[in-house]
């Protein structure tokens, strides 16, 4: 039996069951394959961008994370939190956050490719990332999040941070 009072919403799970029944195994497999293909494309393109390093070399699920190259991060006047804010101005929800305990010094960004996310949308996201980087690189002064990081002060993300508040590197 399913309870509607569980801690996590079940609507997404029910939606997946519905899709699986409606599409069948092969149809659902194709949906997941398409999401994975788009995720690999975005992963590869982000890996080509000068400021970034992908956390892993391959994508096995339709999600991945990346971070600023350490040498780039030391000289940059901005952080991934600033990139998150720029992308949110264009309607993208690409969170920047610290990793969980014992890795909380690392700030990463995450992309999750959901069903229906097309190659055209991926190209729009990549274009918005490139435009945001161009804007951020033109800054004359460090952003408040960059200054806070330099002083080892708490930097709170607006989206998600595993309960960690600081970034020390």
PLM region spans:
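PLP-dependent enzyme catalytic core of the Aspartate aminotransferase-like
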Residues: 103-169
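Generic non-transmembrane alpha-helical segments
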Residues: 41, 45-49, 82-92, 128-139
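A glycine-rich phosphate-binding loop feature that marks nucleotide/adenosyl-phosphate handling sites
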Residues: 34-39, 55-65, 100-105, 144-155
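Conserved PLP-binding catalytic core of the aspartate aminotransferase-like
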Residues: 52-93, 113, 119, 156-168
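Catalytic cores of large soluble enzymes that bind and process phosphate-bearing ligands
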Residues: 27-34, 38, 75, 114-117, ...
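Flexible glycine/proline-rich, aromatic-decorated loop/lid segments
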Residues: 4-9, 84-101
